[in-house]
Amino acid sequence: MADLEEQLSDEEKVRIAAKFIIHAPPGEFNEVFNDVRLLLNNDNLLREGAAHAFAQYNLDQFTPVKIEGYEDQVLITEHGDLGNGKFLDPKNRICFKFDHLRKEATDPRPYEAENAIESWRTSVETALRAYVKEHYPNGVCTVYGKKVDGQQTIIACIESHQFQAKNFWNGRWRSEWKFTVTPSTTQVVGILKIQVHYYEDGNVQLVSHKDIQDSLTVSNEVQTAKEFIKIVEAAENEYQTAISENYQTMSDTTFKALRRQLPVTRTKIDWNKILSYKIGKEMQNA
C-alpha cells in the first residue's frame, strides 16, 4: 500500500478524491468528504484540487438552499449559475453567493434577469409550485426563463429528498423539464432521476433515470402552464409506478435467481437444534 501511495502524484490523488465526492449518495456528502479528507491527509490540496467536484455535486444534485430574508428555498442548478460562485433566484429576482462546501447562501442582491418571457416563467412557476406542494412532501422547485440557442425557453427543475441516516437510508428525486415558447405547438423534453442508498444490512444503491418527450399546445401563458403540468404529472406518476412495479418483479424473480432463500436441501437450518446436539455430545464425552 505504501508503494502505491508513493507512485501516485498529488494530481492523481485529487482526481480519485474528486470522483468519490461527485458520486457521493444523496445526503452523504459530508461523510464522503470527511473520509476522503482523512485518506488524502492534505486539506489545502483537497480544497484547491477538488473544488470543482464540490460545485459539480451541488449542480448535479439540485441542492436546495435557504436564503436569509426569503421564505422559499431555491435550487442550485447549472441554469442559475451566473459564474464566479454566484447563482440566480428567478422568483425573488436576486443573485447570491453560494459556498459549495458549506452549502450556504450569502450576499443576496437584486438582479434583473431576462424578462422577455417573464410572464410565461411566472405562470409556469405558479402552476408548478402548486403541483409540487401536492405531490412532494419536501419538494422544492425553481423555474427559469432564458434564451437557449436563440429561442426563449422555460426550464423547470424539481427536487425532493428524504435523508434518514438513523434508519440507514437516504434518497433524492430530481426532474428537469424544458420547452421553448413558440406559436401553436412545442416539444416538452424532460428527464427524471431517482437515487436511493440503503446501508443497514448491506450496501445497495438504486440509480435510475428516464427521458421524456411530449408535445405541448401553446396558447396563453396560464392555459399553457396548466397543460404543461398535466404532462409533468402524467409522466412522473407513470415513472414512479413503473419503478415500484419493477422492484416488485425483481423481488419475485431476479433476486431469487441471484440467491436462494433456502439452502440446497430446501429446508431451513435449525441452529438451536444443532447447538443442542453439539452440547449434548460434549456432555456425553465429558
From Swiss-Prot:
Coiled-coil intervals, chain numbering: none
Q: Which GO terms describe its cellular component?
A: brush border; cortical cytoskeleton; F-actin capping protein complex; membrane
Q: What is the top-level taxon of the source organism?
A: Eukaryota
User: What species is given as this protein's source?
Assistant: Rattus norvegicus
**What InterPro entries has UniProt attached to this entry?**
CapZ_alpha, CapZ_alpha/beta, CapZ_alpha/beta_2, CapZ_alpha_1, F-actin_cap_asu_CS
Task: Spell out the subunit comment.
Answer: Component of the F-actin capping complex, composed of a heterodimer of an alpha and a beta subunit. Component of the WASH complex, composed of F-actin-capping protein subunit alpha (CAPZA1, CAPZA2 or CAPZA3), F-actin-capping protein subunit beta (CAPZB), WASHC1, WASHC2, WASHC3, WASHC4 and WASHC5. Interacts with RCSD1/CAPZIP. Directly interacts with CRACD; this interaction decreases binding to actin.
Question: Which GO biological-process labels does this protein carry?
Answer: actin cytoskeleton organization; barbed-end actin filament capping
Which keywords describe this protein according to UniProt?
Answer: Acetylation, Actin capping, Actin-binding, Phosphoprotein
Short name of any one Pfam family annotated for the protein:
F-actin_cap_A
Similarity comment: Belongs to the F-actin-capping protein alpha subunit family.
Respond yes or no to whether keyword Ribonucleoprotein is given for this record.
Answer: no
Chain positions with Phosphoserine modification = 9
Functionally, this protein is described as follows: F-actin-capping proteins bind in a Ca(2+)-independent manner to the fast growing ends of actin filaments (barbed end) thereby blocking the exchange of subunits at these ends. Unlike other capping proteins (such as gelsolin and severin), these proteins do not sever actin filaments.
Descriptive protein name: F-actin-capping protein subunit alpha-2
Positions where N-acetylalanine occurs in the chain: 2
Name of the coding gene: Capza2
What GO terms are given for molecular function?
A: actin filament binding
